[in-house]
Amino acid sequence: MNYCPRPKYLYKKKIINKLIEKFNYKSVMQVPKLKKIVINQGINVLIYDNKTINNAINNITAITGQKAIYCLSKRDESGFKLRKGTPISIKVTLRRDIMYEFLDRLINIALPRVRDFVGVNKNSFDGEGNYNLGISEQIIFPEINTDSLKNNFGMNITFVTSSKKNKEAKYLLYLFGLPFKTKKNV
């Protein structure tokens, strides 16, 4: 038997049927799905050095299980003391099984470790069915060794869905188990 991550199995066996039932799709191909998860981590340019960049890349690689790349600035910006070609952020795009494994670890392990966590903001959709989640500290992930961590950067996690409507995407992420804030738990 082949390995299948828990959220992917859940999607195939239960979520598709619940989405068809709720939104009355005529075909299984109309059902929205999670296309990719993009993790972006900005780096403070003022403390930039190669060691900082390499540590940040190693941390994101440990969290996601996939090698991260750095993004370079496109132009000079004197207000930020930024030069063209300077690394300003790190990103990694997750697809297929690695995406589902990361989603499982995020929902079941990392988010419950956030101090005073009451749920994620339900208004962070972009109007195209994509959801953005900001995390202020990367130490919520158990893969990060807090003893050797010098710079604790935050990160932005974007869930890209095939849905074009926020309502459908929100219900899809809710069925995956993403804990949205409700009036009860605030």
From Swiss-Prot:
It comes from the Bacteria. GO terms for biological process: translation. Signal peptide: none annotated. InterPro entries: Ribosomal_uL5 (IPR002132), Ribosomal_uL5_bac-type (IPR020930), Ribosomal_uL5_C (IPR031309), Ribosomal_uL5_dom_sf (IPR022803), Ribosomal_uL5_N (IPR031310). Keywords: Ribonucleoprotein, Ribosomal protein, RNA-binding, rRNA-binding, tRNA-binding. One of its GO terms (molecular function) is rRNA binding. Pfam families: Ribosomal_L5, Ribosomal_L5_C. Gene3D superfamilies: 3.30.1440.10. The keyword Amino-acid biosynthesis does not apply. GO terms for cellular component: ribonucleoprotein complex; ribosome. This is one of the proteins that bind and probably mediate the attachment of the 5S RNA into the large ribosomal subunit, where it forms part of the central protuberance. In the 70S ribosome it contacts protein S13 of the 30S subunit (bridge B1b), connecting the 2 subunits; this bridge is implicated in subunit movement. Contacts the P site tRNA; the 5S rRNA and some of its associated proteins might help stabilize positioning of ribosome-bound tRNAs. Part of the 50S ribosomal subunit; part of the 5S rRNA/L5/L18/L25 subcomplex. Contacts the 5S rRNA and the P site tRNA. Forms a bridge to the 30S subunit in the 70S ribosome. HAMAP family: Ribosomal_uL5_B. PANTHER family: 60S RIBOSOMAL PROTEIN L11-RELATED (PTHR11994). Belongs to the universal ribosomal protein uL5 family. This is Large ribosomal subunit protein uL5.
